[in-house]
């Protein structure tokens, strides 16, 4: 098993052990408190930051399917982070998020949740090759 495969397995493990997403439907997100929603957003954001650190730690020496999957996942993460930054007026701290209207928080949560699914899909396909 090479370094790329180990990194992919590690990231998939992080995703599978942090299943604090996928448990709430879009409708339910509108019924929970803002505090719960902010906590969920921050937890997802923290998990994604860990994943990005793990993916960026790989030496980008050899281009193969594993490396291409890692680069694709990093690109999705960075693109989503830009969108989240824009949606949150460039303040993704708890204090900054608390100033946002609830529909905006729901949108941020759903984007982060979707990102987790996309990363998982990209890496699972490559891992199973």
Swiss-Prot record:
GO terms (BP aspect): DNA replication
Keywords: DNA replication, Early protein
Organism superkingdom: Viruses
Family to which the UniProt record says this protein belongs: Belongs to the podoviruses GP17 family.
Function text: This protein is involved in the replication of the phage DNA.
Name of this chain's protein: Early protein GP17
Organism: Bacillus phage B103 (Bacteriophage B103)
Gene designation per UniProt: 17
């Amino acid at each position: 098993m090479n370094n790329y495969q180990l990194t992919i397995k590690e990231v998939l493990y992080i995703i599978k052990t942090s299943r604090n997403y996928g448990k709430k439907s879009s409708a339910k997100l509108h019924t929970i408190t803002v505090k719960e929603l902010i906590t969920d957003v921050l937890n997802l954001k923290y998990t994604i930051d860990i994943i990005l650190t793990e993916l960026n730690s790989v030496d980008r020496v050899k281009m193969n399917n594993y490396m291409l999957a890692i680069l694709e996942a990093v690109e999705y993460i960075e693109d989503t982070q830009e969108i989240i930054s824009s949606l949150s007026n460039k303040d993704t701290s708890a204090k900054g998020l608390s100033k946002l209207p609830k529909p905006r928080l729901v949108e941020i949560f759903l984007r982060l949740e979707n990102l987790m699914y996309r990363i998982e899909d990209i890496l699972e396909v490559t891992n199973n090759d």
